[in-house]
Amino acid sequence: MPGHRSKSEKKDADKQLRRDPYEVLGVLRNSTDQEIKSAYRKLALKYHPDKTANDPVAADMFKEVTFSYNILSDPEKRRQFDSAGFEAVEAESQELELDLSSLGAVNTVFAALFSKLGVPIKTSVSATILEEALNGRVSVDPLVLGQAVSKKVEKQCAHFYAVTISEEEVSAGLVCRVESSSKSKFKLLYFDQEANSGLSLALQEDSKRTGKITSAGMYFLGFPVYRLDHTINSMAQAKDPETAFFKKLDGFQQCEVTELKAGTHVFAVYGDNFFKNVSYTIQVLCAAAFTQEKEDLRSVEAQILTKRAELAKFETEYREVLVQFTDMTSRYAQEMQSIDELLKQRNEIHSAYTTIPLMKRSSSKNRMRKSSFKKAAAKAPAPTEQEEEEEEEEEEEEESSRQKNKKPSTCDKSETLKKKSKWFNLHLKLDKKKPC
C-alpha cells in the first residue's frame, strides 16, 4: 500500500512536471513582449474556465498557461528564468491574473479587501468580453477625433469606440487618453481587426492614480515611447521597501506599438472596479498641435532610461557600502567593549597597589564608632562617691559662671519693666479735703 506523499514531495513532483514557459505558450526565446502577450491571450481564451467548466484537463492547461505568462511577462522574472531556470524564480510568489467576472461574491470581497490593504492584485479582462469581441458580437460607437466623450460603464464590462485617422494624422501622431474623476479602476484596450471582422486584444493599459484622478493613455507618436508597470514595484515594496527603490524603474519598458496606420482603429474602456460602475472620459487626439510636448516626452524618457542604468550601478555600489557599514558598526561596538574592559582591568591593577583595606561607607563607620565607644564605656571602672561630688561641684560652678556672663534678653527686660510699673500704677484714693 503506497504511503501518502508529503507537501515537499508533491512540490518537487510539480517542479519536475513543469514545462518550459516558452514551450507552453508556443513562442521562441527571442519573442517580443507583444508576441508573448498575443499567444497567452489566445490560449487563455481557449482554456478559460468559463468555456470549459467541467474539463479538468483544460483547467490545468489554463493554470499552466497563466503561470508561464506570469514569468515571461515580467522582465525581471524572464531574465531570471533565462539565466537559471525555475530555481531562480520564486514560484510561490507568482501572482495570477484574476478574472473578477468569474469570482463569486465572497471571493470578490476578499480580493477587494486584500487590494485595499495594499496587496498587488492583477486583474484580467473578462474572457466573455474577449470572446464576444473576437466573434464580432460587440457594439462599437464612432468617436470623433479631438472630441471628449464621458460615460459610465458597468464593472467587468466594456465600451468600444472606433476612430478613423488619415495619413497626415498618422505622421503627426495619435494619443488616446482616458480619465476618471471618481478615481475608478479601469483598463484602456486597443484591438486589432481580424479578417472575419472580429477584434483581438492587442494592447492593454491599466489605470493609475495621478493626483486626484485615475488615468491611462496610449501614445502612438512615431518614435519609441515607454510604459511604466507599477505592479513590479508594488510587489517589491511588499517584500522589501529598500529593494523597491532600486526596482522602481524595472517596469519602465518600451511599448510594443509606436505608430498606427491610416484607417479605422478600435479602443475600449473596461470597468475594473470590484463593485461599482466606472465613470470615465475618453478622448483621441492628433498630436500635430503638441510638437513641444512630443520633444519633451522624448527627452524625459531618454533621461529615465539613463537613470535606470545608473540605478543598477548604484545598487551594486550601495550594497557594497552597506556591507562595509554593517561591518564597521559591528567593529565599533566590539572596540568600545574591548576598551572598556581594558580600562576596567587597569583600574583594578591600580587599586591592588595598597596595604590599606578598602574604605567602607560612612554609615558603617559611624556604627563602628558607636559600638566601640559603648564597649570602652562598659570596660571602664565605675567612679567613686568623692569623684562624683567633685564633678557635681564643677558643674554647679560652670552653671553659675554662665548665668553671670549671660546678657539679659529683650524678654527679660520687658518682664522687669512690668514688675516696676506695677508699683507706680497703683490706683490710690486720696481725700483732697484732708491734708497730707
Curated annotation (Swiss-Prot):
What is the tissue localization of expression for this protein? Expressed constitutively in seedlings, roots, leaves, stems, flowers and siliques.
The family classification in the record reads: Belongs to the DnaJ family. B/II subfamily.
Keywords noted in UniProt:
Chaperone, Coiled coil, Membrane
Question: Where do the J domain residues begin and end?
Answer: 20-85
Q: Where in the cell is it found?
A: Membrane
Any coiled-coil regions, as ranges: 291-348
Bias (Acidic residues) occurs at: 385-399
Q: Which organism is it from?
A: Arabidopsis thaliana
Which protein, by its recorded name, is this?
A: Chaperone protein dnaJ 16
The way this protein sits in the membrane is described as:
Peripheral membrane protein
Q: Give the SMART domains listed for this entry.
A: DnaJ
Q: What Gene3D superfamilies does its record include?
A: DnaJ domain
Protein's UniProt keywords contain Membrane: yes
Give the signal sequence positions.
Answer: none
Q: Which residue stretches belong to region Disordered?
A: 360-416
